[in-house]
Amino acid sequence: MPETMTPSEIVSELDKHIIGQQKAKKAVAVALRNRWRRQQVADPLRQEITPKNILMIGPTGVGKTEIARRLAKLADAPFIKIEATKFTEVGYVGRDVDTIVRDLAEMAVKQTRESEMKKVRAKAEDAAEDRLLDVLIPPPRDIGFAQPEEKDSNARQVFRKKLREGQLDDKEIELEVAAGMPGMDIMGPPGMEEMTEQIRSMFAGLGQGKKHRRKMKVHEAFKLLVEEEAGKLVNEEELKHKAIANVEQNGIVFLDEIDKITSRSEHGGGEVSRQGVQRDLLPLVEGTTVSTKYGMIKTDHILFIASGAFQLSKPSDLIPELQGRFPIRVELDSLSVDDFQAILTQTDASLTKQYQALMKTEDVELVFADDGIRRLAEIAFSVNEKVENIGARRLYTVMERLLEDLSFHAHKSSGETVTIDAAYVDSRLNELAGSEDLSRYVL
């Protein structure tokens, strides 16, 4: 379970996908572990222990967002990643910051429902199986004889065996299922998400309880009936209470692009709204109560992780109150040639493995030689230095350019083996990488 993972185990999991940035990984791992530690503390003191929010500072493409993505998969907790630039000050047209907590609540309810459904899945499958057998072999009318019941029982066992073995999967049956409301989306004005959600939930309940007959194949019917039966076994009210508790105690919010809402004294214009977003974030990060359709949610123990490149601004450009709410500062390093080489070879789903898998579908064997990978890393680093530093994302453009012709003519090279060595890389990329004007527009 993720909550019992030690910080070193969390870091080793992140190492599979992100190269370097040990400071950021350690900070995130400790913050995640502290959620578990807090749960072990006795109650009066537990309420006083609040999470220490993290601010990650570093150039674009070095792993800030990737750490958040991998953390979301790793943390068995309600997690939401949002861009700070999406929000506006209350009173302006746009989304206000309270929607962060509402979205987190939606995520938690979905997560809790999936978890509860898994617990009752075995019972739901049995009930769905019985309902399918009732359709395949309608039960006989009661006419006072015992013998037909025995025959029916034997027939049910035969059909049950066939059903479990998948022999009846393609048989078409007519089934009575719960009628869902026709898909209807309500487009509300910006900033009125709560009202729109209330109207949507009001209309959602209109079609409940109604049933209609549908023709479908047995395997489709089984999936539908399992969902329906599991829904009956799950207590919705209890589910909502669990979800709210999960958000309040374990919720994690990743605020990306926080540097884009800083106020810079030398720039005028839309600074009022930007500062307003920072002021609106203050109570949310410090701890407040937000109204959602599932109930009131306290944000006191939600962990906030913010990140930004801070190329045009500094962390000190944030309003002082917000700076104080992010006590842990972590600086991420720019990527070196060795880092680029490691990204191409050591990560679990590296670009080289992805392209090899894609070419394999055309029966083309792609082999990356060590000197070829080193040359790719050098070119990516060089272009970043000369033009604009976009971090690891530069590898996407370099790799696409390198394999452009091969990808286009792959169907003609079926059964061949293509080796990507330093000479191959130079023949495709040297001219582009050497010319600053060309690399500016092409790479």
From Swiss-Prot:
Keyword Electron transport (UniProt): no
Signal peptide: none
GO terms for biological process, alphabetical: protein unfolding; proteolysis involved in protein catabolic process
Gene Ontology CC terms, in alphabetical order: HslUV protease complex
Primary role: ATPase subunit of a proteasome-like degradation complex; this subunit has chaperone activity. The binding of ATP and its subsequent hydrolysis by HslU are essential for unfolding of protein substrates subsequently hydrolyzed by HslV. HslU recognizes the N-terminal part of its protein substrates and unfolds these before they are guided to HslV for hydrolysis.
Gene3D superfamilies: 1.10.8.60, DNA helicase RuvA subunit, C-terminal domain, P-loop containing nucleotide triphosphate hydrolases
Keyword entries, A-Z: ATP-binding, Chaperone, Cytoplasm, Nucleotide-binding
Self-association state and partner proteins as the record states: A double ring-shaped homohexamer of HslV is capped on each side by a ring-shaped HslU homohexamer. The assembly of the HslU/HslV complex is dependent on binding of ATP.
SUPFAM superfamilies: P-loop containing nucleoside triphosphate hydrolases
Origin superkingdom: Bacteria
Protein name per the record: ATP-dependent protease ATPase subunit HslU
Naturally occurring in which organism (per UniProt): Ralstonia nicotianae (strain ATCC BAA-1114 / GMI1000)
SMART domains, per the entry: AAA (SM00382), ClpB_D2-small (SM01086)
Binding site for ATP: I19, G61, V62, G63, K64, T65, E66, D256, E321, R393
Pfam families on file: AAA, AAA_2
